[in-house]
Amino acid sequence: MLKEINSQFYRISLSWTRILPNGGNDTINQDGIDYYNNLINELLANDIQPFVTIYHWDLPQVLQETGGWVKDELIDYFLQFARVAFENFGDRVKHWMTFNEINQICEAGYSEGSFAPNIVNKGIGGYECTHRVLLAHAKAYRMYDEEFRPTQNGSVGIAIDTYFHEPRDPNSESDKQAAEVALIMNYGWYANPIMLGNYPEYMIERIRNLSLIEGRNKSRLPEFTPEQVELVKGTYDFLGLNHYSSDLSYFAGPNDGDNPSHWRDVGVQGYQPDEWGQSASGWLRVYPDGLRGILIWIKENYGNPPVLITENGFSDLDGLEDDGRINYIQEYLYATLEAIHEHQCNVIGYTYWSLMDNFEWNTGYTQRFGLYHVNFTDPERTRTPKKSSLVYKNIIDTRHIDWDFEPSKK
């Protein structure tokens, strides 16, 4: 499939338990190492660069049973995992990401309880988890920088997912401020420490004040020590951006009273208007200007770092004539070009999610994002190219968005 569309790289992730079945590096599963070596070598043999994410949400159960990502011990376990990855694959892998989507790991997993490990601890768990994941990322980056970069000469980043938040009313100062607050509290929460060394000042003050009102003697948002500020600051060679959709924002609290939560801390609500094109996912409406907007926002707030779009995609229910996906890809790539050429955003690459239909977390096999259709009822899991795969191939081959391209006519 990758050869058919002439893809230059392939983004894969490592399964922690496939490599370290007990969580730590006391037991290394050679079969797991061999599996990834074979995959990496086959990609390179076909002139496809492997792009490897170390952690994509699959924490070994034995480590979850000790508390998971709200425990400091997880940082050292992750470093063991990262070291094994760098040692075994780093001679050939030149592009790494430490984590995929801290928001889904932490806020969804340890605060809202909507993703594994399904812990509900609103307004606390997500912050505790994020703090440790950021420290784990930073230590892994420093380890690579000091021990592996001199001989392997690769790059290390992290993927942060975000909506772009537009003001509900572009002429309303209140709504414009709400959109900015939403970006600070939802994207800046993760990016600010990596870029500048600490959480956004607005976020620190906001959560501290709300914590005092709640009768607490300290903020629900953990603090970085001065040493940790220096540790975390600048731990990127590029920023990975996962972006699918956007919303229109305005100031309003959640509907759960004064109970602590991240959304109460944010104090902003958002919605997606009906005129935005619909996908098969309730959260994903089509608004290409949002991708351009978040790229510009990153440039203006963080000094125009290299940004690799690591996920961007469209879901439908089934079928091979996926014109909705084609429109999405073309429109979002055009918005990316506008960000590059009109606003000088430092975009270094684009990754479509996903190559083929897959298991989409809580929605299982019911929503399809792939360029290739997978027959999940066939024991062979037959793959069939969708119309979008041919359009995407044409874009790769020509480096041009041909709005009139029709595969059936070529």
State where each predicted segment sits.
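Active-site region of glycoside hydrolase catalytic domains
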Residues: 22-24, 33-410
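N-terminal structural segment of carbohydrate-active enzymes
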Residues: 1-29, 33, 39-42
